[in-house]
Design a protein with these regions (language model features):
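Transmembrane alpha-helix termini and helix-breaking/packing motifs in multi-pass membrane transporters
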Residues: 140-159, 228-230, 256, 337-355
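Helix-loop junctions on the cytosolic side of multi-pass membrane transporters
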Residues: 161-164, 169-185, 371-383
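Cytoplasmic helix-loop-helix junction between adjacent transmembrane helices
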Residues: 98-136
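Paired small-residue
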Residues: 91-99, 288-296
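C-terminal ends and interior cores of transmembrane alpha-helices
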Residues: 75-88, 272-285
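Helix-loop boundary and gating motifs at the non-cytosolic
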Residues: 1-52, 200-242
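Juxtamembrane intracellular "pre-TM" segments in multi-pass secondary transporters
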Residues: 1-3, 176-206
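Helix-to-loop junctions at the C-terminal end of transmembrane segments
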Residues: 54-65, 150, 250-263, 347
């Protein structure tokens, strides 16, 4: 077990969560004369860059190693934050998004793969949960710091964000690479095996995508509309955002939870919980209950992300890890386009329709997850019979 890697990843997660301007990123851009339409185009550039660079980064990572890939990606991450600080025009922010896309696609799967290989398999879930917890803690500290120090100095918030990301770039040099098992190296160029692995994982990737995107959309875009409809004053939104981030710290309890409840059974419980919450918010007219429901949604989303990191890494046996994880991520980014458009159409009709669509997605996700779980269980039993005739 590479204990130094674990501690370094916790520090990196915290530092990269310190985005001091996150709560005013829209205002920051509008102050530079960027319109909302231009912001949409800028975010589209990010999405395109992530899709374009995802698989190439996976291939590069399998060739040069996890540590070097993370160091290079964190270098681009720092440059993206520096570009954001310096940007004053549309093209300046486009450059920032391109750099961020390169960094995000490089880190995607690579950091979790190295972390997974740095701990015993039975401790992976808890480690992923704590890593997510430290990232959330960083976001909470950033939100508080903005209110205390940067509320009248947006440029200062961007500068200190860049400084924190430079620190994470430097710290990433202290990571130690972990070599893959020999059998994985022997099939490093096996595109067929990689494709077969992705095909087997398709149902669970669809399932997790439907749950996480449903919860993310509701808690990021539609919660404010719900708060207004139940009479919560706008000045409370910042505090509720802080509480929502704190709820994400619950991922630190995953190790304890999965010791008592089998991982896949707990995942199924999260799907049921998400569907019930989506239906419940339709009939909710209470301010307190609305807040509680959205906090529970954040909890379900955060825990699903952490558990999926374990499931995805566990599925890789005999294929190049980074390339396979990149293909998983590529599929999910493509799926995000579908869910985003679907929620947009539903929300244009009514908020109730968007909540109902979320419930449908979660039920479909549950069915897809159960299908994957049963197929995997049958495959495991078959392999056990063949190995013990």
């Amino acid at each position: 077990m590479k204990k130094n890697n674990i501690l370094i990843f916790y520090v990196l997660a915290f530092l990269q969560g310190l985005i001091f301007y996150s709560s005013v990123c829209t205002l920051y851009r509008t102050d530079c004369g960027i319109s909302l339409t231009q912001m949409g185009l800028i975010d589209g550039v990010l999405c395109i860059c992530v899709i374009l660079f995802e698989v190439p980064w996976g291939l590069i990572c399998d060739r040069i190693g996890y540590r070097k890939t993370i160091v290079i990606s964190n270098g681009f991450f720092f440059l993206s934050k520096l570009a954001f600080y310096k940007a004053t025009t549309f093209w300046g922010f486009v450059i920032e998004r391109v750099l961020l896309g390169i960094a995000s696609s490089g880190l995607s799967g690579c950091d979790t793969a190295l972390l997974y290989l740095s701990v015993p398999k039975e401790k992976a879930i808890g480690t992923f949960g704590r890593m997510s917890m430290f990232g959330t803690l960083g976001m909470c500290c950033a939100s508080l710091s903005f209110s205390l120090f940067f509320s009248h100095n947006l440029r200062g918030a961007a500068l200190w964000t860049a400084i924190m990301h430079f620190a994470s770039f430097v710290i990433s040099f202290f990571l130690v690479d972990v070599k893959e098992e020999k059998k994985e190296q022997e099939t490093k160029n096996s595109l067929l095996q990689t494709a077969l692995t992705c095909k087997k994982m398709l149902p669970v990737l669809i399932a997790s995508l439907l749950l996480t995107e449903s919860m993310h959309t509701l808690t990021t875009y539609y919660n404010q509309l719900q708060y207004e409809s139940v009479g919560i004053p706008v000045q409370w939104f910042g505090i509720l955002f802080m509480i929502m981030n704190l709820v994400s710290l619950s991922t630190g309890l995953l190790d304890t939870i999965t010791q008592r409840i089998q991982r896949d059974h707990f995942m199924m419980m999260l799907f049921v919980m998400a569907a019930v919450l989506s239906i419940g918010i339709i009939f909710t007219h209470s301010a307190i209950l609305s807040v509680v429901i959205f906090e529970c949604m954040v909890c379900a989303e955060s825990m699903t992300y952490a558990l999926m990191n374990d499931i995805q890494n566990e599925s890789i046996d005999g294929t190049p890890r980074a390339s396979t994880l990149s293909l998983y991520s590529l599929f999910q980014h493509l799926g995000m386009f579908f869910t985003g458009v679907s929620f947009g159409v539903a929300a244009d009709h009514s908020l109730t329709a968007a909540y109902g669509l979320s419930a449908v997605f979660c039920v479909v996700g549950l069915i897809s997850y159960i299908f994957w779980y049963k197929n995997r269980s049958m495959l495991v039993k078959k392999e056990e019979k063949e190995s013990n005739p």
